[in-house]
A protein has these predicted regions:
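Catalytic nucleophile loop
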Residues: 137-140, 163-183
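N-terminal chloroplast transit peptides
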Residues: 1-33
């Protein structure tokens, strides 16, 4: 699919400060972000041509479950997913500010499971680290910060290639699960930084809302519920399904098969349909098809 050229006219910025570097910088940044978004859209349009038979993903809603430690609730899933063949995991800590402390925590956990862990922030060449990785784990934190770092380091296409073409196992937790999907449009996080595009890795053809929270019928809080926000997202045209993963749940994707695992169920939102409940063990393989609808 070849998209036509997109011509963007950057509007003149309001005079909020003296003319000078700020205006030029802001206009330049806006133009670059718009052009990057167009490039990402063209890249996404080609995704359907990539074979998915080798794809292996473990998409976890949350890293820590109430009453437990870091990755405790899913550690057996991780061990079964990686198996004995993988010896070391490449960790991507970009979602948190303190990457050193984050990598230390992740390393201690994976070493307790029998795996080595190298953090990508310690590498002089992040792209080369991805190309050599036996497995990739992207941790949680702020999804906007994470996606911006992936774009800034030129890692979107290298990670896609390793996972979709080379069959390298991918583990995502929270924000790491968000960026595995088509876009981060349904994240819960604040946009504290601005990635060039909301389009993400596109390892699956739908969106996920990690930490999905059911409405509290006894609450007096007047803010929008998670469900209302997702329904607002689906008021926009051509928006993909959204899988609300409750804390304690995870999605295992092997090739063209997707299965809900963990301790809790999930809630599925498909544009134009009522939300549906799904228990652990549910088969979500139909979501992996382009233009997925209810089975």
């Amino acid at each position: 699919m070849v998209l036509p050229p997109v011509h963007v006219r950057v509007a003149r910025l309001p005079r909020l400060a003296p003319r000078g570097a700020w205006h030029a910088s802001a206009a330049t940044t806006l133009a670059l972000h718009l052009r990057a978004g167009v490039r990402a859209a063209r890249f996404s349009a080609r995704a359907a041509s990539v074979p998915m038979e080798r794809r292996r993903l473990l998409l976890v809603s949350n890293s820590t479950l109430h009453g437990g430690g870091y990755l405790d609730h899913c550690q057996e899933h991780i061990r079964n997913f990686l198996g004995a063949k993988v010896k070391s995991v490449l960790f991507v800590p970009y979602a948190l500010h303190d990457r050193i402390a984050y990598a230390k925590m992740a390393r201690e956990k994976f070493e307790s499971l029998g795996y080595g862990l190298d953090s990508i922030h310690e590498s002089l060449d992040p792209g080369e680290a991805v190309r050599k990785a036996e497995a990739i784990f992207i941790g949680g934190g702020n999804t906007f910060r994470l996606l911006k770092a992936l774009y800034d380091n030129g890692l979107i296409q290298p990670i896609r290639k390793r996972v979709l073409e080379d069959g390298v196992p991918y583990i995502g937790s929270s924000a790491g699960t968000n960026v595995a999907t088509i876009s981060i449009s349904t994240t819960n996080d604040m946009p504290i930084v601005y990635p060039p595009s909301l389009l993400a890795l596109g390892l699956v053809s739908f969106n996920i809302n990690p930490h999905y929270l059911d409405p509290d019928v006894n609450s007096t809080h007047m803010g929008e519920t998670r469900e209302k926000r997702i329904l607002q997202y689906h008021e926009e045209p051509d928006t993909p399904p959204v899988l609300g993963l409750r804390e304690g749940s995870l999605l295992l994707v092997e090739g063209n098969k997707a299965t809900l695992q963990g301790k809790t169920g999930a809630r599925l939102f498909v544009r134009g349909c009522d939300p549906t409940e799904h228990a652990v063990g549910a088969d979500f393989s139909f979501l992996l098809k382009e233009d997925a609808k209810k089975p």
